[in-house]
Amino acid sequence: MTLDTKAAAPERASALAYFFLTCTALCWGANAIFGRLAVGEISPMLLVALRWLVVVMLLAAFAKGAIRRDLPALKARWGYLAAMGALGFATFNGIYYVAAHSTTAVNIGIIQGAMPMFVFFGAFLAYRTPVTALQVMGAALTMAGVALVASAGSLERLAAFEFAPGDVLIVLACAIYAGYTVALRRRPPVAAFSMFAALAGAAFATSLPMVAAEAALGRLQWPTTTGWIIVVLVAIFPSVIAQTCFIKAVALIGPGRAGVFMNLTPVFASAMAISILGEAFEAFHAAALCLVLGGIWLSERGKAGA
């Protein structure tokens, strides 16, 4: 192998990883679009349950070897896996799809883009992770962006704490998912797809009481034809494809560099909301997006200098 070939190998790996990460961010951004399209086509909790049922069936078919090998380790940590699947996969998505009934996909995407800051706060509270001044400034900018979106750019609404219910729910969902992300530090030493399958199974099981509650409240809606299409789409794209691409990208360039690419999620979500759903993109959306992405960039700079 020549020196040029050796030098080109890391570049090819990086290029492939960037492709995988772009696909991941695109799929996660699409989840906001699917959430909005699902309104009137399928009820939120039923969408969550059917989504994870389809994922479990797909993983059982294509990843059964890895699951079988890791089954003893998974059984030993069943309590942890049940809690993680219930929170990170079932509850997060349940709140997410409920929120889609009372806010826009643009708002969902921008607020979800602040997820790294929620993880930052969670890591500090749980593990006392060292914090730099730049990280604090970045967090403040990002939260300002979230507040700007939630108040629709109105200082009066912000001062009166008048926020759309959907925006508040997305903030809550992000906080829950941040807790899930922080708790991943304690994951069992198993293959990524085995872990994913276990969490998906736990999410399906724990979503069933949520569906029962939805039915008891008279809010259960069986999927229309469009609803069934959305179920398949959310199972394949934001779930299986996004997770597969992310796992492959992390293996190629590591979690630190991979995480930065997730900043593309609100950009893709906003672009798709405008082009597919015809949603308006106001000046305050642009300002909020700049604040969120700028805050995350500043925080990453602070981490690098720590």
Predicted regions and their residues:
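Glycine-/small-residue-enriched transmembrane alpha-helix faces in small-molecule transporters
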Residues: T2-V48, E156-R186, T206
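Helix-helix packing/entry segments at the starts of transmembrane helices
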Residues: A25, V48-L50, F89, I108-A114, ...
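Transmembrane alpha-helical segments that form core, pore/gating elements
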Residues: I33, L59, V119-F121, L125, ...
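Hydrophobic/aromatic residues within transmembrane alpha-helices
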Residues: A38, L47, R51, A99, ...
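Hydrophobic transmembrane alpha-helices of multi-pass small-molecule transport proteins
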Residues: L59, G122, V131-G153, N263, ...
